[in-house]
């Protein structure tokens, strides 16, 4: 057998095992089908997708995605309406409009280049008792937009449905409500909206997956103690129908 591992982070190369059965693909998993064919595989027995940002990425100051370090900000800033939608939809930031007003006002005077500068700009709208959680939402929203993460997730799941063998498992670990909602809907209905599609003639429901775990799997308290970053993880499993 062979295991293909996808990671678009070049730093992940340092952790690649020396095993002829393992193929490291330094690209986003949205290219799943293309690279399977490139390496001579048309079908997969199973697919595991861990959607979390690695601890290394959180801890590496050079990424510009963590609010804990002073680093050059690796993010695009868009027009006001688009930026508001990004924070509201991808980060579920409650005061998104006020947040964007501060960003736009500051950007009119100078370019926002560092995480520290960004933090100082948005400081007036950060809840004092929920600073860490608020900042996590803000940076999550920007990361999702910059990387096109939700679109990539949908593309990967659609391809997974095509390349999995009958009986093959699709296992996905999510870490926030937006991506979990998409995964939940797709595994139940075959699309991100969760709408079951019926045959126009007989009215039969067409869907290629059946759920293995009806109830989402979450980490135990013991696991959270060992790995606090697993606190928000949710694991869903589906089987491709025969």
List each model region and its residues.
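S-adenosyl-L-methionine-dependent methyltransferase catalytic core, i.e., the SAM/SAH-binding region
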Residues: 1-242
């Amino acid at each position: 057998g062979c295991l293909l591992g996808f990671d678009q982070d070049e730093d992940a190369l340092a952790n690649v095992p020396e095993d002829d059965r393992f193929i490291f693909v330094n690209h986003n998993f949205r290219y799943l089908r293309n690279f399977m064919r490139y390496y001579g595989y048309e079908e997969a027995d199973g697919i595991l997708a861990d959607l979390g940002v690695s601890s290394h990425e959180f801890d590496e100051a050079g990424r510009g995605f963590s609010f804990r370090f002073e680093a050059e900000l690796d993010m695009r800033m868009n027009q006001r309406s688009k930026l508001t939608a990004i924070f509201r939809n991808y980060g579920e930031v409650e005061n998104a409009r006020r947040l964007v007003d501060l960003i736009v006002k500051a950007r009119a005077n100078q370019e926002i280049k560092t995480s520290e500068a960004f933090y100082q700009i948005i400081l007036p709208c950060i809840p004092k008792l929920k600073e860490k959680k608020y900042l996590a939402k803000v940076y999550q929203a920007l990361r999702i937009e910059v990387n096109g993460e939700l679109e990539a997730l949908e593309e990967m799941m659609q391809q997974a449905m095509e390349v999995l063998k009958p009986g093959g498992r699709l296992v996905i670990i999510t870490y926030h409500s937006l991506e979990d909602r998409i995964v939940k809907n797709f595994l139940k209905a075959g699309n991100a909206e969760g709408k079951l599609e019926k045959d126009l003639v007989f009215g039969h429901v067409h869907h290629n997956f059946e759920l293995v775990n009806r109830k989402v799997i979450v980490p135990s308290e013991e696991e959270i103690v060992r790995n606090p970053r697993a606190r928000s993880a949710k694991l869903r499993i589906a089987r491709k129908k025969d």
